[in-house]
């Protein structure tokens, strides 16, 4: 094989180079003068085939930047060392390891195949750095440089340009362990060598199995298999174990305690504790589904009973070792858990959580962080985990097409009064998912003899080796290399294709077909061995090793069988359905393999091509119900001290004391803004998100509850919320559990739900449970959670545990300390939502004292306990007082709020949690961009000591704050009194308090707090906003272009001045009503081809928008067009190019998609003909917009390639998820007719949305001919290049392009995710009144109605 090199510069941006140089200086004291970079594309093709001129031209177009041909070179590097100073210059090249094909190569070769370059079978991209240093770099310094620029698991140093991908590695032979001869000693040896995590009971059990029962030696493959399948991670020994608590045998296991909540409150439950997700009854739902799953076809309306599903899990150990990869595969694994429920289910949205140790942000002092703490070398530091784990999870969800709609994060590291250091060195990476399923597919069917075992998804790689057993160990107990080997690597685009075939099978039944899936399980811990045994249990199967698709020819049998390579499911189907599944998979371009058959002999047998059987295990022996293990749990007396304020704060005035406390608390990660997390993750894809993290005119990240819709046609849906209060556990595990459940419910209660009894929960436990004093705390928490839930009438129906939450860290004296993470319980609720438009959000909405009242619901009954609060944490304390427990009051409050929500008597509402009452009020004020005047009663004679005021304002007892209209005050108070909810009137929204004497002449709203008429706090909103945003801002500086981060902060502070100020939306037209007979009219309706490519994810919402406007939408893949299964012929009046990440954005956004059209003559002719017809239109959104530019459809034909406008990487250097303001300009665009002059909000999500043209004359032409009809504008409706109003940094505010005849329109933002009013995160009253309410289509439906009007005009 021949490898040819192609070069493109630069590989990384200027700001990334600056960041790299800064990190080298800060972390290793290495001074670098300059760094130049380039990519090297290593392209492999057969020796006997030299690329001809046409093939090379195609490849160059794909690999190069179209407008920068000078920055691309064939065979010749751009990087040269000088002849005079080579001592201080070095070229460093890093790239993928040769032994496996990367995700990049898989996508790149798929693109090549679509572009008639199937001769190319591999393309690997390396990065080359020309480093000029102040002095010659030592070997150690080069290693330190390498640490910062590559992933040592998947990449390596290239000392010279590579000549071959062949490594010469031969797969390791199967080894047999001499258990028959040596007994237990042989197993002990392999246990240590392979990191299998066998304990004493395991060793005895498996020695007996092989020595006495099977009477043979196990292979290393079998040992590895058993080690993964029977680890704590997989078997949950602790939750299933016998517990001796303080010397007394508990009559229930932890699982029995947890499951008893469901036994007591089974209402609405369909699947619980028995599948990959849990499920509850949902609603009968109208859906829009393609008629066929194996060929292009029209979308048709259908109905199904649609239960709601939820799953939640953690990926803590892998995230601690490799944060980005651990979090992305945690997300991917949870996604597969979601769709592998029953006989296949439907993914909708995700939830996330991150808990890390002290951040230690360079240059940003947080006074409670201990700078003397040391961290282990084999794990990432907390700051890196916080940033990179969230990057990994976000990136995977963005590419997959799953929105993240709610979450949490916290940082903790402290020394307790007993001298023990507690910190999340081993982090929490939490991932939850909510979705739906077809009720007909609730139960997996049992295997039958002759059924076919299928592996669907990505090929086998040497990644994720031993993740199950490694996750079951304390961090530091395993060899570092084994730790790193246990981390997986994700491929979101492959995961999305896998999800599509599961969805295709699920949806095949809607229009009269048959779901071929008998059973489905996702591949996770234990790899193929675990999932294949699981799916054929108890009948057994013969599995053929050589049928399992491998991406690495050097893999051994053990690695193919045991590695957790991602994006893989095991399916069980009947033999007669093989052809159907194959057709579905070919259409979606997903690899599948029919790897074996169910036998009925009860044995899982793995057979090599040579006839060897490295696995030959009787399932009843290895998957049997094992004898429970026994755990001894004893309470350890807590050493607690009451919370005290520093003396210097006690002697000053109350305001000084309060200001210092608040300044600290607002900078705590769990309390302050989470903007650094939410702006980089998609929160609207699918078009089914009714409520996500951001609210109010400034799109502020303050949420109670997340809500999704059942579909596009009605108002039913599902709500989910999260509760977690781990720091309270240092005082009392029971209090922690009570507050966790309470927080989950006081977050949930703002959505309109069917019934409290319908609420079901996932319980996730992250604890160092097997260490002294910890298991009993978990036990106490479980008992309290049980009691509270039973009394409330809710229940747990699923969850996961991670019980090795500790890590070894070095001490200054050279010894090690074992650092336990705080014990954590995360409760995720989910419940049917009867009206998604009624959800109450925290942002204040009323205008003045005259029309507003603020109510305070204190479920702590004025006790104001502060133990384990944010306040105690920021003074390096814990406290000793427990919160007030009152479950009946919690239940009554929930019921009262539900009644008020359904009667629409609350304008804004928010729970009390981290940071206390003052934080609740601040978040309501900032999110509404409105002032507040609060006057709390002084019930504790606060003149004597500021501590009582501090406790009043910072206590984290359960509670809530409501904003209501003054005209509704009496009816609201009556309802609250009816439910015996203690309520106080504490103030008013105050948008006109700028006349207050204390404002120093400012025109800003003020946030004012008094206690007993005594002024405690008086601050301008912009100053308050700066404090609340500060830590998020510091984190943002480390993950995006600092210039743009600073711009956002500057603009935010300009905007956060009160009076409800925000975008000035203006709608200049009325929209036509939606027909009630869309389904009946479909056959006569104009036809639009909704075209998607591999990796697209915006097709369903696009089809729905066109359907609502009266079109018959067709589901058309590029595979359909390339295979000639459908023509873009006269029947189609429109084409819609959808959003997403075609080919995972490999070779630049939409480049591969454009190439598959451009370089296929037959398809290219069809598109040219369609474009040339005068009776057609096209609409490209996001990825589709990028495609239309690359095809030259906009702004007009005939532009030279190097001058053709493009949409390139955002100037901020990252994916941007924003709710932006746009103005619709006068233009030829037919689809925007009548909308001119309107200023509207719209979802915008992209990583490459910056308009770019090298030719200023073309830019001038676009402006002169009004060919950019949608432009980014600021709050005043003025065209802007200012970030984040303009999220991509695009010149002239260009957010769109259209053709000169107006028939072809390309838009970067997402009107198809904004065409229904409930999809808008913020809709001001003037727009709401214009469209007729949140249950109506939004102003953006006009685009699609205009397309229909154009088609109608042709007749």
Swiss-Prot record:
It is an enzyme of class 6 (ligase). The keyword Ligase applies. SUPFAM superfamilies: Class I glutamine amidotransferase-like, FGAM synthase PurL, linker domain, PurM C-terminal domain-like, PurM N-terminal domain-like, PurS-like. Pathway: Purine metabolism; IMP biosynthesis via de novo pathway; 5-amino-1-(5-phospho-D-ribosyl)imidazole from N(2)-formyl-N(1)-(5-phospho-D-ribosyl)glycinamide: step 1/2. The keyword Mitochondrion does not apply. Keywords: ATP-binding, Cytoplasm, Glutamine amidotransferase, Ligase, Magnesium, Metal-binding, Nucleotide-binding, Purine biosynthesis. It catalyses: N(2)-formyl-N(1)-(5-phospho-beta-D-ribosyl)glycinamide + L-glutamine + ATP + H2O = 2-formamido-N(1)-(5-O-phospho-beta-D-ribosyl)acetamidine + L-glutamate + ADP + phosphate + H(+). The active site is at 1182 (nucleophile), 1310, 1312. Its main location: cytoplasm. It is found in: Cytoplasm. Signal peptide: none annotated. Residues 1087-1325 form the Glutamine amidotransferase type-1 domain. ATP binds at residues 326-337, 406-408, 913. GO terms for molecular function: ATP binding; metal ion binding; phosphoribosylformylglycinamidine synthase activity. In the N-terminal section; belongs to the FGAMS family. This is Phosphoribosylformylglycinamidine synthase. It comes from Dictyostelium discoideum (Social amoeba). The gene is purL.
């Amino acid at each position: 094989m021949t490898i040819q090199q192609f070069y493109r510069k630069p590989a990384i941006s200027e700001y990334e180079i600056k960041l790299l140089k800064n990190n080298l200086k800060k972390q290793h004291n290495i001074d670098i003068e300059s760094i130049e970079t380039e990519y090297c594309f290593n392209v492999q093709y057969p020796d006997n085939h030299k690329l001809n001129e046409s093939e090379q031209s195609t490849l160059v177009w794909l690999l190069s930047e179209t407008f920068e041909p000078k920055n691309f070179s064939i065979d010749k590097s751009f990087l040269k060392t000088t002849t005079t100073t080579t001592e201080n210059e070095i070229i460093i090249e890093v790239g993928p390891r040769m032994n496996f094909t990367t995700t990049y190569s898989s996508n790149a070769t798929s693109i090549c195949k679509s572009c008639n370059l199937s001769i190319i079978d591999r393309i690997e991209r390396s990065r080359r750095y020309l480093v000029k240093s102040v002095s010659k770099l030592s070997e150690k310094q080069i290693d330190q440089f390498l640490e910062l620029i590559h992933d040592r698991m998947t990449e390596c140093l290239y000392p010279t340009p590579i000549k071959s991908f062949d490594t010469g590695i031969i797969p390791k032979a199967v080894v047999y362990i001499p258990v028959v001869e040596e007994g237990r000693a042989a197993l002990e040896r392999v246990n240590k060598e392979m990191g299998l995590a066998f304990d004493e009971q395991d060793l005895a059990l498996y020695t007996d199995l092989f020595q006495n029962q099977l009477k043979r030696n196990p292979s290393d493959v079998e040992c590895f298999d058993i080690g993964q399948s029977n680890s704590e991670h997989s078997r949950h020994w602790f939750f299933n174990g016998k517990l001796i608590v303080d010397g007394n045998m508990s009559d229930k296991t932890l699982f029995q305690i947890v499951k008893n909540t469901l036994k007591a409150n089974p209402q609405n439950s369909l699947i619980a504790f028995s599948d990959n997700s849990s499920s509850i009854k949902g609603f009968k739902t109208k859906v829009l589904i393609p008629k066929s799953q194996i060929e292009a076809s029209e979308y048709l309306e259908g109905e199904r009973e649609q239960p709601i599903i939820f799953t939640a899990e953690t990926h803590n150990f892998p995230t601690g070792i490799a944060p980005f990869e651990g979090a992305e595969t945690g997300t991917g694994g949870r996604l597969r858990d979601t769709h592998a429920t029953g006989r296949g289910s439907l993914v909708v949205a995700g939830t996330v959580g991150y808990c890390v140790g002290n951040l230690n942000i360079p240059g940003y002092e947080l006074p409670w962080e201990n700078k003397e703490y040391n961290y282990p070398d084999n794990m990432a530091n907390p700051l890196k985990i916080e940033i990179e784990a969230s990057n990994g999870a976000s990136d995977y969800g963005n590419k997959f097409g799953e929105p993240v709609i709610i979450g949490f994060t916290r940082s903790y590291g402290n020394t307790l009064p007993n001298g023990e250091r507690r910190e999340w060195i081993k982090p929490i990476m939490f991932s939850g998912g909510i979705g739906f399923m077809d009720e007909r597919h609730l139960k997996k069917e049992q295997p039958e003899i002759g059924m076919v075992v299928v592996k669907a998804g990505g090929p086998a790689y040497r990644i994720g080796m031993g993740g199950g057993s490694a996750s079951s160990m304390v961090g530091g107990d395993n060899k570092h290399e084994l730790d790193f080997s246990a981390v997986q690597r994700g491929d979101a685009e492959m995961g999305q294709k896998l999800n599509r075939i599961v969805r295709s099978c699920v949806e095949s039944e809607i229009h009269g077909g048959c779901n071929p899936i008998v059973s489905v399980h996702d591949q996770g811990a234990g790899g193929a061995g675990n999932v294949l045994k699981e799916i054929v249990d108890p009948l057994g199967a013969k599995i053929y090793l050589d049928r399992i698709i491998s991406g690495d020819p050097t893999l051994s049998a053990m690695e193919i069988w045991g590695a957790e390579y991602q994006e893989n499911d095991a399916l069980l189907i009947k033999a007669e359905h093989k052809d159907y599944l194959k057709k579905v998979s070919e259409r979606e371009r997903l690899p599948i393999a029919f790897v074996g058959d169910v036998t009925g002999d009860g044995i899982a047998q793995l057979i090599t091509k040579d006839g060897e059987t490295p696995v030959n295990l009787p399932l009843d022996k290895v998957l049997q119900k094992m004898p429970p293990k026994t755990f001894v749990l004893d309470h350890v007396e807590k050493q607690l001290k009451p919370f005290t304020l520093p003396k210097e704060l006690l002697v000053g005035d109350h305001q000084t004391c309060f200001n210092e406390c608040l300044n600290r608390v607002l900078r705590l990660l769990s309390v302050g803004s989470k903007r650094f997390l939410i702006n980089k993750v998609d929160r609207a894809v699918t078009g089914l998100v009714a409520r996500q993290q951001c609210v109010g005119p400034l799109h502020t990240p303050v949420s109670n509850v997340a809500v999704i819709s059942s579909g596009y046609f009605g108002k039913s849906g599902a709500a989910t919320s999260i509760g977690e209060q781990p720091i309270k556990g240092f005082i009392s595990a029971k209090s922690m559990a009570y507050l966790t459940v309470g927080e989950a419910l006081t977050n949930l209660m703002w959505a309109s739900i069917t019934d409290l009894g319908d609420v079901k929960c996932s319980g996730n436990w992250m604890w160092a449970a097997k260490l002294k004093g910890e298991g009993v705390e978990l036990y106490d928490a479980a008992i309290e959670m049980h009691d509270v839930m039973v009394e409330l009438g809710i229940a747990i129906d699923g969850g996961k545990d991670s019980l090795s939450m500790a890590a070894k860290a070095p001490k200054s004296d050279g010894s090690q300390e074992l650092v336990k993470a705080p014990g954590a319980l995360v409760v995720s609720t989910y419940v049917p939502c009867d009206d998604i438009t009624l959800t109450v959000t925290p942002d204040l909405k009323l205008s003045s004292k005259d029309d507003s009242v603020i109510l305070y619901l204190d479920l702590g009954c004025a006790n104001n306990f502060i133990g384990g609060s944010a306040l105690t944490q920021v003074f390096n304390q814990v406290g000793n007082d427990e919160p007030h427990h009152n479950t009946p009051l919690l239940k009554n409050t929930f019921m009262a709020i539900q009644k008020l929500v359904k009667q629409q008597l609350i304008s804004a509402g928010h729970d009390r949690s981290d940071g206390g009452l003052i934080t609740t009020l601040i978040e309501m004020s900032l999110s509404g961009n409105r002032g507040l005047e609060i006057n709390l009663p002084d019930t504790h004679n606060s003149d004597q000591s500021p501590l009582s005021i501090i406790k009043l304002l910072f206590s984290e007892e359960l509670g809530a704050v409501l904003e209501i209209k003054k005209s509704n005050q009496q009816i609201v108070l009556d309802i609250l009194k009816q439910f015996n909810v203690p309520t106080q009137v504490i103030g008013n929204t105050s948008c006109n308090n700028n006349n207050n004497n204390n404002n120093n002449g400012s025109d800003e709203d003020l946030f004012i707090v008094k206690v007993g008429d005594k002024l405690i706090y008086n601050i301008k909103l912009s100053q308050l906003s700066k404090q609340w945003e500060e830590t998020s801002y510091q984190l943002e500086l480390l993950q995006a272009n600092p210039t743009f981060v600073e711009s956002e902060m500057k603009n935010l502070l300009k905007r956060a001045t009160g009076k409800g100020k925000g975008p000035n939306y203006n709608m200049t037209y009325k929209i036509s009503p939606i027909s009630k007979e869309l389904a009946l009219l479909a056959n006569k309706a104009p036809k639009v081809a909704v075209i998607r490519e591999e990796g697209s994810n915006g097709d369903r919402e696009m089809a729905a928008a066109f359907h609502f406007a009266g079109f018959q939408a067709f589901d058309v893949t590029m595979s359909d067009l390339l295979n000639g299964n459908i023509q873009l012929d006269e029947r189609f009046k429109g084409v819609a190019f959808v959003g997403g990440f075609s080919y995972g954005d490999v070779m630049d956004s939409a480049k591969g998609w454009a190439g598959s059209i451009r370089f296929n003559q037959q398809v290219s002719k069809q598109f040219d003909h369609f474009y040339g017809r005068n009776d057609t239109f096209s609409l490209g959104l996001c990825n589709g917009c990028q495609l239309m530019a690359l095809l030259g459809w906009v702004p007009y034909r005939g532009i030279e390639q190097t001058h053709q406008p493009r949409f390139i990487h955002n100037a901020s250097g990252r994916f941007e998820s924003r709710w932006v303001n746009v103005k619709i300009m006068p233009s030829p665009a037919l689809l925007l007719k009548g909308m001119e002059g309107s200023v509207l909000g719209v979802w915008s999500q992209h990583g490459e949305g910056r308009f770019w043209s090298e030719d200023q004359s073309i830019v001038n032409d676009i402006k002169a001919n009004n060919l950019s009809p949608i432009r980014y504008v600021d709050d005043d409706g003025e065209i802007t290049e200012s970030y984040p109003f303009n999220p991509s940094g695009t010149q002239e505010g260009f957010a769109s392009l259209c053709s000169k005849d107006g028939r072809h329109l390309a838009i970067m933002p997402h009107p198809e995710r904004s065409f229904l009013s409930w999809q808008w995160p913020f809709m001001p009253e003037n727009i709401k009144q214009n469209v007729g309410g949140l249950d109506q289509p939004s102003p953006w439906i006009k685009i699609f109605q205009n397309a229909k009007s154009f088609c109608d005009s042709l007749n």
